[in-house]
Amino acid sequence: MHNGRMRVLGVAFVGTATGSRAEMSAFVEDVLGLPRVEVAGVEADLYSLAGGARFAVSSPGGMGDTGRTIGFLVDDLDGALQELRAAGIEVDGQVGENAEHRYAHFRAPDGRLYELI
């Protein structure tokens, strides 16, 4: 439950968009040794990290115009989005959902796109 202050539990997602998706995915699998996972509703090559976090490799445009994004896991997504809006932060109007999470994007003061999960 949201208590008026956002509680970030950790980083649950890191993603990158690249024109070299096949090469990057091969590097992640073959050199870094990350196991690939399939999640319904995700249009990226998705890999499992320790602790349950995910790393995604997508084609250009798959991470917004910044090319990369980080997803912060919060205890109450809806409450955290209300808090961002109240602080004047630009929040994507749609809450997305895949087989694992509900999530929403926001643009931080540095101009980059981030995600709450």
Where are these regions (language model features)?
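Conserved short beta-strand elements that form part of the metal-binding/catalytic scaffold
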Residues: 34-67, 113-117
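Mid-chain, well-packed structural core segment of small domains
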Residues: 66-84, 89
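Short beta->alpha transition motifs characteristic of CBS
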Residues: 14-17, 58, 97, 116-117
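N-terminal beta-strand motif that seeds the catalytic metal site of vicinal oxygen chelate
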Residues: 1-25, 68-70
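Vicinal oxygen chelate
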Residues: 1-7, 82-117
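Short secondary-structure junctions
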Residues: 32-39, 90-95
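Short beta-strand micro-motifs in enzyme catalytic cores
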Residues: 43-45, 68-70, 100-104
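Conserved active-site tyrosine of GNAT-family acetyltransferases
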Residues: 24-31, 84, 111
